[in-house]
Amino acid sequence: LVPRAIEVRGVKVKVEQIDIPVSYAAAFEGERVRREDMHVQFGGKYSRAFELVKTAEGEITDGQVQLVGPDIDSVKAGEAMDLGVVVEVSGRKMQSDFEGILERQIHRYLNHAMGVMHTGQRHQVWTRISKATFAAGFRLRHFGTILHAKFHEDYGQIVDKVQVTIYTRPADIEKLLPQALARYDARDARMSGMTDESVNTFYSCTICQSYAPNHCCVITPERLG
């Protein structure tokens, strides 16, 4: 009843504190986890891994995080596991064009957790969790906790519900990875057909100002920056 009332009235969820057993801050972005300090890793050249954000096709439960398969306490330190992170989102203003934008934020959100190293996106990700972070009690479900909180915090205007399912069984990855690749290809095909003349909005990016203070990129369909 309460979730339905929140949805009908348009009440926005805000998570005041992310419930994970390690510190969480932007200061940890770019932290490297070396092999000798690593408990487990996913993707890269060591295993299969992918991340996918998609608009929910049916009813979802906000805040639900489900792990399908073994957790990271089932492997010995230094081993690799398959990983699939599927984030389903819904909202009155949510559009399929936003999926790729939200998906790219997974890199930043996971990197802000102490002892978590994340690079890449889509099916070209590489993630490591340190021994210290594992010893503190960090588990795969905490990936979902982070994503739920941050999507609501940063994209609350378009996202009403966030549900995360994490897969680690090789059989599930074998089945789901081709589906994810098909979605990536569909997005790329849609983008490749766009031209500067076909849109009425261009965007600017100032991320480079961290090392080039006078720099600003103008982003268009034919000029990506």
Predicted feature descriptions by range:
Residues 1-225:
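Cysteine-centered metal-binding/redox modules
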